[in-house]
Amino acid sequence: LLVVIIAVFALLNRSGEELHEGEILIEAGGNTLGVLTVADLQKLPAVQKKMVIQSTGGMTKHEFTGTPLLDVLNSIDPGLTQKYTRIITKGIDNYTSGVEMSEVLKPNNVFIVYADYGKPLQTKTGGEGAMRIIIYQDEFGQRFTNFLTSLEFQ
């Protein structure tokens, strides 16, 4: 059973494209639709989201700056939300999670954020330019993807 679990995670974490901190590779059906940077996101309407995240390390307060994922998707292709039902998110650390399109379509729910208390999010290597998925209606933050590098539509 352990071998099967490891094989499944290896399959989920493989990628034909090189992932880079500070960039989000957008893929669907094995095709690359584009690459987004913080500068690209900053061209879209920004929102501030205050939240407290509960995790094994305790509670942390945040005031994120970012943009709704729906706005990001519509800037790439307004039909994406109709063509696909799920988005697999991946970080540079190979953390992989999933977001249902129905969650993305809910108002005030799924965001790509790039700053906390007005300061750029740090990359895994300590630089500036990281991005993160937050799901506002997920109080424990278990599906938040830090160091976001990939969105794969399914």
Region locations from a protein language model:
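N-terminal intrinsically disordered, low-complexity segments enriched in P/E/S/T
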Residues: L1-Q154
